[in-house]
Swiss-Prot record:
Assembly mode: Homodimer.
Name of this protein: Ribosomal RNA large subunit methyltransferase H
Species for this entry: Maricaulis maris (strain MCS10) (Caulobacter maris)
Subcellular localization: Cytoplasm
Positions annotated to bind S-adenosyl-L-methionine: 72, 104
Residues passing through the membrane, by range: none
GO molecular function, one term: rRNA (pseudouridine-N3-)-methyltransferase activity
Gene Ontology CC terms, in alphabetical order: cytoplasm
Length: 156
């Protein structure tokens, strides 16, 4: 099952780009043996997008039918790493071909412009910069795959 991060805007070269790429590469390598991956990232050009509705429509346009959709949202469910791993493993075992983790803009998602999500995921009530959320998500996806693969990366 492919795991994809769909995000608004582009991260230029720098420490955040390096970290995102590193975690996505690690996830692809670790997940290959257990049917998870490749890890991918879709960056949506925001220059012509004027509102959260426009942003959400642009995110929706890149979603494949049948993909599991996860919206990152402050009102979502806060899962620990093992719970996220369990959910990803369940989708894989059900034969899902792709799970897409959508990061909205500064004003969040316009839910009326997006398909019904399979999961709304929160990193808690705090507000984080967009670039940092991408790093955190990439790391959590790598961690989830590491848990499912039984590697020693995650410690309880």
């Amino acid at each position: 099952m492919r795991l994809r991060v769909a995000a608004l805007g582009r991260i230029k070269s720098g420490p955040e780009r390096t970290l995102v790429d590193d975690y996505l590469d690690r996830g692809t390598a670790t997940g290959r043996a257990i049917g998870l991956g490749p890890f991918a990232e879709s960056e949506i050009d925001t220059r012509s997008l004027k509102s959260s509705s426009d942003e959400s429509r642009a995110l929706a346009a890149g979603l494949d039918p049948g993909a599991r959709i996860v919206l990152l949202d402050e009102r979502g469910k806060a899962l620990n790493s093992r719970q996220l791993a369990r959910q990803i493993g369940q989708w894989r075992d059900e034969g899902c071909r792709e799970a897409v983790f959508c990061i909205g803009g500064a004003d969040g998602h316009d839910r009326s412009q997006l398909p019904q999500p399979d999961l709304m995921l929160s990193f808690g009530p705090a507000v984080f910069p967009h670039k940092l959320v991408r790093v955190m998500l990439a790391e959590q996806l790598y961690r989830a795959v590491s848990i499912l693969a039984g590697t020693p990366y995650h410690r309880d």
